[in-house]
Structures are given as structure tokens and as C-alpha cells.
Swiss-Prot record:
One of its GO terms (biological process) is nodulation. One of its GO terms (molecular function) is digalactosyldiacylglycerol synthase activity. High expression in nodules infected cells, but low in nodule inner cortex and root central cylinder. GO terms for cellular component: chloroplast outer membrane. The gene is DGD1. Involved in the synthesis of diacylglycerol galactolipids that are specifically found in thylakoid and in nodule peribacteroid membranes. Specific for alpha-glycosidic linkages. The lineage of its organism: Eukaryota, Viridiplantae, Streptophyta, Embryophyta, Tracheophyta. Residues 1-25 form a transit peptide. This is Digalactosyldiacylglycerol synthase 1, chloroplastic. It comes from the Eukaryota. It comes from Lotus japonicus (Lotus corniculatus var. japonicus). It is an enzyme of class 2 (transferase). It catalyses: a 1,2-diacyl-3-O-(beta-D-galactosyl)-sn-glycerol + UDP-alpha-D-galactose = a 1,2-diacyl-3-O-[alpha-D-galactosyl-(1->6)-beta-D-galactosyl]-sn-glycerol + UDP + H(+). The keyword Plastid applies. It is found in: Plastid, Chloroplast outer membrane; Plastid outer membrane. Belongs to the glycosyltransferase group 1 family. Glycosyltransferase 4 subfamily.
Amino acid sequence: MASQRQPPSSSNAFSFLSKGWREVRDSADADLQLMKDRANSFKNLATSFDRELENFFNSAAPAFSVPAMRSASPPPAEIEFVKKLQPKLSEFRRAYSSPDFSKKVLEKWRPRARIRIDLSAIKNAIVSEEIDEGIVDFERGKRERRLSFWEELKGEGEAQDWEPIRALKTRLKEFEKRSSSVEFFDGFKNSEFLEKVKSSLKSMCKEPRDSKEVPPLDVAELLAYFVKQSGPFLDQLGVRRDVCDKIVESLYSKRKNQLLLPSLSGEESSLLGNGNINDELDLRIASVLQSTGHRNEGGFWTDHAKHDLSDNERHVAIVTTASLPWMTGTAVNPLFRAAYLSQSEKQKVTLLVPWLCKSDQELVYPSNLTFTSPEEQEGYIRNWLEERIGFKADFKISFYPGKFSQARRSIIPAGDTAQFIPSKDADIAILEEPEHLNWYHHGTRWTDKFNHVVGIVHTNYLEYIKREKNGALQAFLVKHINNWVARAYCDKVLRLSAATQDLPKSVVCNVHGVNPKFLKIGESIAAERELGQKGFTKGAYFLGKMVWAKGYKELIDLLAKHKADLDGVKLDVFGNGEDANEVQSAARRFDLNLNFQKGRDHADDSLHRYKVFINPSISDVLCTATAEALAMGKFVVCADHPSNEFFRSFPNCLTYKTPEDFAVKVKEALANEPYPLTPEQRYQLSWEAATQRFMEYSELDKVLNKEKDGAKPSKNNRKIMAKSASMPNLTELVDGGLAFAHYCLTGNEFLRLCTGATPGTRDYDKQHCKDLNLLPPQVENPIYGW
């Protein structure tokens, strides 16, 4: 039964396949023919559009040549053309503006380069044949789909005109309203576009006003500015600063008399009238540079990665070369400065002091006092300070590694001192003894890390060095090295007196005060004297570290020369030091009436009743003991020397110029009673007044208030801002080059040893790592190589 049905089934399948293949082929031929017809219709439509557009231009051309047009004339031919063209264009626009046009074209009209069998259609045909032996009309379905596609296109936006045609109609209507061609051209002349073109041409042809107003620099001005900016180099060659200023003034004055600065405004001219010749030259150069549009973008050595001021919190780091319990000026005065600066809420203060290993502590600190940890020494420092100032100072104390040099009798920093101030706190640096801190400094440049660096000169090193072997040669070298490091690492230098070396960027101002305890002692003694009691019951004394350079040589020479004149005058001497034995031997040799005692604090009770303090030293920069003696209401006999200039205004300060005058002043002081201090004199000696002077002369008040006053600068600030905005600063370039050369030289251990550096001070050692919990220098500053 099954075998009989098999042949009919095979023939039916074959007939179905042949029939299906024929239908697919016919359908593909029909689709291809339809695509050809559509392409021809598009081509014809484009041809007709081009032809009628050409007719439009031809018909519109005569209208523009007519000299006058009447508003009552019939509509031009182009309007009728647009009306005829509108249906075709609308159909064309609707066909191509449909958002689904491209998608539908790809779906409906995609080209079929190869004829493929639609398997789904075959499947449907087989099913259809199996059920009712019917055949699906594929052609009718395709035609129905095409009709629905065109119906969708025709149904979209029939009521809207094509955008270009609508714009064209609007322009033609506006053109019809013109009464004549004259009005047309008048409107063109008054159009906004033409006005803009005219103004642009005027601005292009106009010469810059500033370039006419500011005369160019002449040779004399260029030479004057070159000499002024070459000051650092000439200073290293030994040319004095006043000589350079005279050369600059002579060169610039000739040009100034001819020019009279006509390019400057009245406000700037008034500023020049109140300033010196250097400021006038700077502003003249700045005005020329501004007229050319030049703006200074910073120097070659400028480092912009400095402290961020966005948090409006300022930080002051005070770095010094000594620490308590060593009773020296560089240990005591920076401590008081930190305490009084911390009273202001404008800034936070950090005091950075040297940490000595135990072996060095035994050599430096008195009474065999040593510390096992930085925390223990910090506690000692704070207790000592609070006992004297009477309030709790809110500042931070940090330590950097140092080594004591017995040859130089000072502490030399070991490693990069600047690295012990975190970058987030690197805002303002105060370097106590900047030359000492930077002689062998091998590390980050202070002015690169900090926004403002102030150096305070405490010691007259040149005077000390001259007393040594080959002192003249050493002093010559040290003088230029001091100039070198001061230029390279400081923005401002304060000299406590004119006795110090005239360093670059420096001014003279006493920014030290006295311990408040001394003022209280003076007040108590003055109160006793007002009650009729005798305040001073003892004679004369001298106090200081017992080394020859601290005035002991001058003291013994004066007493020996006028031994007869000062017969009966007994002098008590308090001090410890390396030259104690030699000083005492010299006094015995001359049979001087000197009573040597161990050193003690100047505020000790045993010293309150002395009436006369004798200080013949001429090596001091500003003797702290002299200020303390004046604060206690004593007489002071001192040399007529620049180091004592600050004290001359006090009536109890008796200065002498000759050895004979010394004897006269000592007798005068012993025979009379000191004058009581006035409130103004007490304030002048106080740390409050010293801090105020420091803020003013270091320009720290301007730096701290820069953010607040930036919105409303003063006249002087505007002058400085005008100069800094345009002038390329040769000085900064020189300073950066000096700092780089110094860094290279101090990195060589052989050169360091040749110049007297303590061995092993380029980096800190293992004991410092242990005491301060530091990483080894090889890890902290690795050296990479191949």
C-alpha cells in the first residue's frame, strides 16, 4: 500500500519545486523592473525640476533690470511659476522628508543582485498544498504592500510647503514692496551687515593707540636697566651697591629729563614722584612691555608647586641653628618669636630646631644635661618658655638632625633641612641665621618650596673669622659665600644692626625683644626706688660666653690700659666657654681686679642688684644681654658701634668712643643712679613691639593680608603689580642659577670637606634615624643607576 503511494508523492514534490522556482523568478523580475521604473521616474523628476528652476531664473532676471516697479502692477511670472511648481515640489518633499523614508526604502526596494529562495515561502506553500492544494498569490501581496507604503508617504504633511519655497515666496513678497531700486540700495547701505563690515575694516586699519603713546626705550635706558639687573653679578665681583645705583641714576636721568614719562597716567606719575630712581626705571620698562602686550610667564627656575592657599590658612615655619638648654641667642630669640607669632589667629607656627645625638649633647648643653628623645627636650623647652612669658604658647616644635662642629663651635644641619617641614605647611619660612643654615645646604631650595622666605642675621661671622689664622682670606671667601646663599635662598633679609655684612635684599631693623621677666624685674626695682629704698646695691658686672670673640679681649685691654684710672673698681664676670682658662690667665697676668664666676641666667636673682652692665664687645650684632640690662633699669656702658645703635636712644645707655672715654663712662655710671624707664621705652624693648617691627620690615603683614586686600589694592600695590605682571626679572634668573650651582657644589663630599664642612653632614646618620624615627637617607632619597 505504501509502495503504491510513493511515485505520486515524488512527482508532486518535483512539480511543487519547479512551480515555486518559477514564481520566485517571476517575482524577482517584477521587482527589478519596478526598481528601474522608479529610478527613471526620479531621473525625469530631477530633470524637470532643473528645467523649471532655470526658467524661474530666466523669468526673474528682467525684473531686476527695470529701473522702477509699481506696486499696482500684476504679479510677476515667477509667482505663477511657483504656484504651478508647488504640487510637484510638495510631492517630492513629502517623499523625501519622511523620517522612515530611508528605512522603508531599504526594506521595500533594496536591490537583489542575487536571486535567493525564500524558504519561509516554500514552507508556507508546502503547508498550503498539504491542506487545500492552493497556491499563495505572492505578487498581489507585494503590490498591496507597495501601495500601502506610498499611501503612508502621501498622508504625511500634505498641508505644508517645502521650507526653501516658503522662504523664497517671503523674499519675493518683500521685493515687490520696494517702490524703486533706489530704496533697495538705500536699504542695503543702512543694513546691519554693512555697518558691521565697516566697523571691522576701521578696527583693522586703525593703529594701536598704546604703541603711539609709549615711546620706545633708548640706549641709555637699556644700559641703565642692564646695570640695575646685573647687581647680583657685580656684587659678587665686589662692586658696591651705591656705585651701581649712581651709574643707573646718571644713565636714566638724562632720558628722564627729555621724556618726562608722557606715557604714564597722572596717578602713576605721582607715584614716580614719591619713589626712587629704581622704581621709576622699573615702571618705565613695565609700561613699554605692557604696550607691546608682553606678559611675564615666570622665570626659568620658577617652581609653581607651592603651598596651596585655597584653605585660607597660613603657616609660618621658624628654622633656627640652636636649641635650649644651650643659652645662646639663636636658641632663645627664635623661641620667643614663635611664641608671640602664635598669638595671632592669622597663622599657625612651627619651630624647627636641631636635634643632637647624645655624644654631641654632652659637648654643647650645660651641666651635663642630656635628653633621650625629642619629646623629652620639647617638654623642657616648653616649661622654660612658659615660666618666662606667662602664657601657654600654641605652636608646634619639630626637630631636624644636626651635628656639632667643635672647630666652628656651632651646629651644622645634616641632610636637607627643608624636608622636615611638610609640603602642606610650606607657606612662609623664617630662617634664623640664613647664611649658617645654607652654607652646606644640599636639598630643596627654600624659595621653591615656600611662598615667602625671610632671613634674620644674628651673628657677625666675618668679625669672628678675621680673628682666626689666615682670617683675612677666609673672611673674603665667607663674605661672598654669604652673599651667594642669601641671594639664592631668601626673599627678604633682616639685619639686626648695621654691624653685619651688607647682604642682598637686606634691611636693618631690630626685631628682637627681651624676656617679659626682665621688664617685671625693672618695674619692681623702680617701685622700690619710688618708696625710697635703694634698688641697686652692687657695682659693675659683665656676662657672656667666655670666648675671646665675645668681648673678653676688648675688656682685658681696656682694663689693663686704664688700670690706674679704674683703681678700686671691681668687676664680676659671669660665663662659661672654651677660652675660660686663657681669659682668666690673661687677667691674672695683668693683675686685674676681676672676679670670675660660673655662667648663669641673666634673670637670676643674684644679678638683680647690679647697677652697671659693661659690654665692650664689638663683634656682636645686637647684644641680648645689653637689652636685658636696660629692661631691668641698669646703666649700660658699651662701645660706640653700629651693634649698639638701637640702644642709644635710652638715657641709661652710655657709649664711649676711646679707651679714655671708657673709663669716664664707667665712673659716671657708678657715681649716679639710673633713670626709670618710661612706658614707651618699656614697650620698645618688649617682644610685642619687636613682633610688630618684624611683621612690617619682613613684609609679612602684606603677605598674610594679601588675600583680604587683593580686591582693593593701594597705589603702591598697584605699582608693584603693574611691574610684576609684565617685567621679565633677570634677578630671579640669576638667583635660580646661583641656587643650582650651590646645589651641585654641595653635593660633592670632597668639596664640602675642603670648605670646612663637618664630615657626614650631607646626609643624617643611623643614630639620627633611630632618635627621630627617620628612614635611612638611601631610602628617603634613593639614587637610581644602571
